[in-house]
Amino acid sequence: MTEITLTAPKRLRGVIQVPGDKSISHRSVLLNAIATGSAHITNFLPGADCLSSVACVRSLGVTVEQPHERELIIHGVGLGGLRESTDVLDCGNSGTTLRLLAGILSGQPFFSVLSGDSSLRSRPQRRVVGPLRAMGAQIDGRADGDRAPLAIRGSTLRGGQYELTIASAQVKSALLLAALYADGPLTLGGRIDSRDHTERMLAAMGVEITVSPDRITLHPPTAATAPVALSLRVPGDPSSAAFWWVAAAIHPDAELVTPGVCLNPTRTGALDVLRAMGAEIEIMNERLEGSELVGDVVVRSSVLRGTTIAGSLIPRLIDEIPVLAVAAACADGETVIRDAQELRAKETDRITTVAAGLSALGVTVEPTIDGMVITGKPDQLTGATLHSYHDHRLAMAWAVAALVARGETTIVEPAAVVISYPDFWQTLAAIQEDV
């Protein structure tokens, strides 16, 4: 399927089981691979990115069974049990796989090479390579380690203190995983205000890690604090649910329910923004599942107004900005997005590609160095031909826009959704009603 053409339906209704959370699915594989014992993972996200993590740990000697598409049994080999791969470790399109594995492999007594597809090989890696080198890691790559392939010769790693300069969960996680192999405690400060699934999972596995608002300290494991396999049900992904939240809010006749979604406070920025814009949102049945807060989210047709998305909100919704930009285009008034320069290091330069797509839909939008200014107006979207550029979140954001655009909207390269939401197009068709 090289393109898909959509028109606006009269009504949206449905209860949508969104895929398992992408971040937690990755970590369930990578952390259990180096734990002791076997872990049973259910509601795993079988998207291309998470399957890259599975393929890589298998190449490193870990046995991973997959009885069903969304179920894994991971037989951990312990902190010292990984084996040198005889081939390049192919991370596909997955920056999470590459960066978290860079942390783990930096402390192994063998040589590894991490690479991926053309998109991943073009994305900046010095943000993780630099801090790992500061811990003593021996990593080389193109552009002095800023581009994959990355060659890693395992070495003795040092603990100490490191100040993070960007709020990146991937960088933070890579350092924490490297610290499992360090000669002393690692303390992280600075921009630690990104999603915290790694910290939660390590603690649940028995690792000695302390977290405060401005510091994270991990102590290298002893025999008593080495990670133990953690079985879990992966909660629904809020970054995937956000497409349905926005769809319901901007459509004139909609009610969509997304049950069992992760409501970890580091991941609920999109809900906070939509509420600030006036969206009618109801959260029911909040509960703890494992170490994560989960709930059922109901969103109904709403009258939205412009807002500002900036500062500490950004790390809590960085992946949802493409679809929040669609919400902003349908709101009354101006929406300002700033402090989001991290968007330029995603699968595409999402500041440029989102602004170009909105402009094609008839929206007045001004891209800036770290975000954009969107002039919103209800009922202003006009169908157009939009490119995903192989970026899964762009493809889905443009599909949401098509639900309220006049005329036909054609999306080129819609198959990009396989990265994080393989069933997206089937779900989109199922919730549309033309009564």
UniProtKB/Swiss-Prot annotation:
Keywords (A to Z) from UniProt: Amino-acid biosynthesis, Aromatic amino acid biosynthesis, Cytoplasm, Transferase
The reactions it catalyses are: 3-phosphoshikimate + phosphoenolpyruvate = 5-O-(1-carboxyvinyl)-3-phosphoshikimate + phosphate
This chain's protein is named 3-phosphoshikimate 1-carboxyvinyltransferase
> What is the annotated role of this protein in its UniProt record?
Catalyzes the transfer of the enolpyruvyl moiety of phosphoenolpyruvate (PEP) to the 5-hydroxyl of shikimate-3-phosphate (S3P) to produce enolpyruvyl shikimate-3-phosphate and inorganic phosphate.
Q: In which pathway does it act?
A: Metabolic intermediate biosynthesis; chorismate biosynthesis; chorismate from D-erythrose 4-phosphate and phosphoenolpyruvate: step 6/7
Q: Give a yes or no for keyword Ubl conjugation in this entry.
A: no
Identify the catalytic residues.
319
Family recorded in the similarity comment: Belongs to the EPSP synthase family.
One family name in Pfam for this protein:
EPSP_synthase
Q: Which GO terms describe its molecular function?
A: 3-phosphoshikimate 1-carboxyvinyltransferase activity
Q: What is the lineage of its organism?
A: Bacteria, Bacillati, Chloroflexota, Chloroflexia, Chloroflexales
Which Gene Ontology terms describe the biological processes this protein takes part in? amino acid biosynthetic process; aromatic amino acid family biosynthetic process; chorismate biosynthetic process
Q: Which InterPro entries match?
A: Enolpyruvate_Tfrase_dom (IPR001986), Enolpyruvate_Tfrase_sf (IPR036968), EPSP_synthase (IPR006264), EPSP_synthase_CS (IPR023193), RNA3'P_cycl/enolpyr_Trfase_a/b (IPR013792)
Q: Where does 3-phosphoshikimate bind?
A: 22-23, 27, 168, 170, 319, 346
Is Transferase a UniProt keyword of this protein? yes
Where, per UniProt, does this protein localize?
Cytoplasm
Amino acids binding phosphoenolpyruvate: 22, 95, 123, 170, 350, 393
EC number(s)? 2.5.1.19
One CC-aspect GO term: cytoplasm
Q: Assembly state and interactors?
A: Monomer.
